[in-house]
């Protein structure tokens, strides 16, 4: 993981994602619904729900939208969703994982396959790609107006139980064992740190540079996947070239 900046790659795609706010709220509503359905509507006793609520707040999701999703979870007749992961390779042979919440596996499998193959990629069998990624807790602290140097930040992160930290001019990226994520987050919050992003994510063990002549095609593939209502997350091992 050392030397891999997830934040750099997120920022490389940020402008494209900013135009999808309505779609993001729709996906978050489904995540909130599922988390509340499985673990109850109280985030203090449901770590999964607290995590999704943090994501919703970071995305500036309206409180009414959050409330509607939680209220829906108490409806016994509301739809249920299956969690499904698809694996494949995008343009340039870059590994990708697609996580979905679906009420129709056949529909979602078909639309994911079309999005990947249409843009020069191919689907892969279960297990062909997932071993290249590790589940990690991921916390990002912006360096804007933060009077803490890298050494102090690293000391605080490790003391809280973090595994690793990456530093850029813009942010500190902190990685944790997924089981220790809540502990690390809470310990750093107690020290006054605020997060611009905090989530459980899939981190590639190694990055594959996206060829410059494939960047547009790769982005188009991700856009089509993320436009699918069933797709919740798209993870890639792609290293985006600097602008």
From Swiss-Prot:
What name goes with this protein?
Probable transcriptional regulatory protein LCABL_11860
- GO process terms (BP): regulation of DNA-templated transcription
Q: Name one molecular function that GO assigns to this entry.
A: DNA binding
Indicate yes or no for the key word Transcription. Answer: yes
Q: Which domain of life is it from?
A: Bacteria
One GO cellular component, as annotated? cytosol
Which compartment or compartments is the protein found in? Cytoplasm
Q: Which Pfam families does the record match to this protein?
A: TACO1_YebC_N (PF20772), Transcrip_reg (PF01709)
Recorded family membership: Belongs to the TACO1 family.
Which UniProt keywords are given for this protein, alphabetically ordered?
Cytoplasm, DNA-binding, Transcription, Transcription regulation
Q: Does the keyword Cell membrane apply?
A: no
Region: Disordered; residue ranges are 1-23
């Amino acid at each position: 993981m050392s030397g891999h900046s997830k934040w750099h790659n997120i920022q490389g795609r940020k402008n494209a994602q900013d135009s999808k706010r309505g779609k993001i709220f729709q996906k978050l509503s489904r995540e909130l619904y599922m988390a509340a359905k499985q673990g109850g509507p109280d985030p203090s006793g449901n770590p999964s729900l607290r995590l999704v609520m943090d994501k919703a707040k970071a995305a500036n999701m309206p409180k009414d939208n959050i409330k509607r999703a939680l209220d829906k979870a108490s409806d016994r007749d509301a739809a249920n969703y299956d969690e499904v992961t698809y694996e494949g390779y995008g343009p340039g042979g870059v590994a990708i994982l697609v996580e979905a919440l679906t009420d129709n596996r056949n529909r979602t499998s078909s639309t994911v396959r079309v999005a990947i193959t249409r843009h020069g990629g191919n689907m892969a069998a279960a297990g062909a790609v997932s071993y290249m990624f590790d589940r990690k807790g991921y916390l990002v602290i912006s360096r804007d107006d933060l009077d803490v140097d890298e050494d102090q930040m690293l000391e605080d992160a490790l003391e809280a139980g973090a595994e690793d930290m990456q530093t850029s001019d813009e942010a500190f990226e902190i990685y944790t064992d997924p089981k220790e994520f809540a502990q690390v987050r809470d310990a750093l919050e107690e020290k006054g740190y605020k997060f611009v992003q905090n989530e459980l994510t899939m981190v590639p063990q190694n990055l594959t540079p996206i060829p410059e002549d494939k960047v547009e095609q790769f982005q188009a593939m991700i856009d089509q996947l993320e436009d699918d209502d069933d797709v919740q997350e798209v993870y890639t091992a792609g290293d985006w070239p600097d602008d």
